[in-house]
């Protein structure tokens, strides 16, 4: 075998390995989307809702996990249900919490 053919063969092997690796990345992405469809149910809207619920999440930075970060409460929280026209604001949840605490305090004072 000449040096040229050995070099060409080596180049072909490297190119094939790089294509196989990129195919594995796509395969993992497809598997994640398939799992999302199964998790959220095919009858409840199919691929579109799975994409909205599961899809294109941005990677979180280290400062997102700081105690003062607004994302800290969502770090280990359950996934929120899909709402067509938006989600309820944080103020609603705060109001519910405060009213519950006031009721408990009032009940303890009696």
Swiss-Prot record:
Disulfide bonds: none annotated. This is FMRFamide-like neuropeptides 11. The keyword Calcium does not apply. It comes from Caenorhabditis elegans. GO terms for molecular function: neuropeptide receptor binding. Each flp gene is expressed in a distinct set of neurons. Flp-11 is expressed in the DD, VD and DVB motor neurons, the PVC and URX interneurons, and the AUA, BAG, DA, LUA, and SAB neurons. Also expressed in head muscle, socket or sheath cells and uterine cells. Expressed exclusively in PHC sensory neurons in males. Expressed in AVK and RIS interneurons. One of its GO terms (cellular component) is extracellular region. Keywords: Amidation, Cleavage on pair of basic residues, Neuropeptide, Secreted, Signal. Belongs to the FARP (FMRFamide related peptide) family. Residues 1-22 form the signal peptide. The lineage of its organism: Eukaryota, Metazoa, Ecdysozoa, Nematoda, Chromadorea. Residues 23-29, 88-110 form a propeptide. The modification Phenylalanine amide is found at residues 40, 54, 85. It comes from the Eukaryota. One of its GO terms (biological process) is sleep. It is found in: Secreted. Its main location: secreted. The keyword Oxidoreductase does not apply. Residues 60-85 are annotated as: Disordered. FMRFamides and FMRFamide-like peptides are neuropeptides. Induces sleep-like quiescence behavior following release from RIS interneuron. Helps to sustain locomotion stop after gamma-aminobutyric acid (GABA) induces fast slowing response. Inhibits the late-stage body bend swimming frequency in animals through several receptors including frpr-3, npr-4 and npr-22. Disruption phenotype: Does not affect the body bend swimming frequency of animals. Exhibits normal pre-molting cessation of pumping. Larval locomotion quiescence reduced significantly and nose immobility reduced to 14% from 48% in wild-type animals. Photoactivation of apft-1 increases nose speed during quiescence in contrast to wild-type animals, which significantly reduce mobility. Shows higher RIS activation at the onset of sleep. Shows diminished RIS-induced body elongation, briefer slowing response and transient stop at the onset of RIS activation. Reverses more immediately after RIS stimulus onset. The modification Glutamine amide is found at residue 72.
């Amino acid at each position: 075998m000449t040096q040229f053919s050995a070099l060409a063969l080596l180049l072909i092997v490297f190119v094939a390995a790089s294509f196989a690796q990129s195919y594995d990345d796509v395969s993992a992405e497809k598997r994640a989307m398939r799992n999302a469809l199964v998790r959220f149910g095919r009858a409840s809207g199919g691929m579109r809702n799975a994409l909205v619920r599961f899809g294109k999440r941005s990677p979180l930075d280290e400062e997102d996990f700081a105690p003062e970060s607004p994302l800290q409460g969502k770090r280990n929280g359950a996934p929120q249900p899909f709402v067509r026209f938006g989600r309820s604001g944080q103020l609603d949840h705060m109001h519910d919490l405060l009213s519950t605490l006031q009721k408990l305090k009032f009940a303890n004072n009696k």
